Amino acid sequence: MTARQPDGANPKPVVLVLQDEPILAGIMRDFVEEAVCEAVVVRTAEAAVRTLEGRTDIRVVFADLDVRGSTTGLKLVAMIRDRWPPIELVLTGALAPDLDAIPARGVFCDKPFRENKVISAIRGFAA
């Protein structure tokens, strides 16, 4: 369920954060909030899909491609681009994928994070 904003209020853009490691999830959430966005944090690709199916207000997915589960990071990226084409993608991982695998309107931010790069990407896509 999406939170209702008071009449006349400008809601913050919503960013779905996918990260299975709690400490990294907290860091990623902090980056989203620093970008003046609302963070919705999930721990699995399957939970990310369920969240996207249930919400229409998500503008950006900030996802770790190394999350454990039955759906790999790049398969999730392809699914998001196919089912929710307007959603922008900020992707991360310990190892950079083949950059040709990153879809248009997507960016890869490697670890360790460069805070300014991540926040700028989120702000740019959420605007």
Report residues per predicted region.
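Two-component/phosphorelay signaling modules centered on CheY-like receiver
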Residues: 22-40
